[in-house]
């Protein structure tokens, strides 16, 4: 699971660091220990360019999330999957794409924007997507077109948003649009 942070955050925001793990990391570790989750590798990347404050410039943050898939598929996935035991037979593009059934991408807020961009530009590398609380407009039709020619069973999207979240209207409209999409 590649799990992206939200705006004004970084790669340590969600799970913490080895020295200072977050409460969420402890929840995951305990769920695995109790058999509620199968063991998994969680990678917490960042779309930030040079600073965790890149999110302060909304247009820059959107540009960084739009381009992030390049670093993800060309550098990060090969680095992770060459260092850890995964389902990929190797790290060539074909081998990584062949293992997409065992890979998910999710993110919160601006990480959710990154999740939709990953769906749009790297669907060949991921089967599962977990966008959470995406409070902005995107070119949804362009995103859905990424699935053109694919069976609806070829990918799975689980959107999450709270009913009191400011992004509720964005996400419910996006979910309705996706259901109505030809893809």
Label each PLM-derived region with a short phrase.
Residues 1-183:
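Non-catalytic cap/lid and distal C-terminal segments of serine-dependent acyl enzymes
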């Amino acid at each position: 699971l590649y799990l992206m942070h939200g705006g004004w955050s970084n790669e340590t925001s969600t799970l913490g660091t080895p020295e200072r793990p977050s409460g969420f990391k402890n929840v995951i570790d305990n769920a695995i220990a109790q058999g509620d989750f199968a063991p998994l590798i969680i990678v917490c990347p960042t779309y930030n360019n040079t600073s965790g404050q890149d999110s302060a410039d909304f247009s820059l943050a959107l540009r960084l999330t739009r381009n992030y898939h390049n670093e993800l598929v060309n550098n990060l996935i090969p680095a992770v999957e060459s260092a850890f035991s995964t389902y990929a037979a190797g790290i060539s593009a074909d081998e990584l794409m062949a293992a997409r059934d065992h890979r998910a991408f999710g993110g919160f807020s601006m990480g959710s924007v990154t999740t939709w961009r990953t769906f749009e530009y790297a669907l060949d590398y991921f089967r599962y997507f977990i966008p959470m609380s995406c409070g902005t407009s995107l070119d949804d039709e362009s995103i859905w077109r990424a699935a053109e020619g694919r069976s609806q069973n070829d990918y799975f999207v689980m959107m999450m948003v709270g009913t009191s979240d400011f992004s509720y209207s964005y996400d419910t409209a996006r979910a309705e649009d996706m259901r109505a999409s030809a893809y």
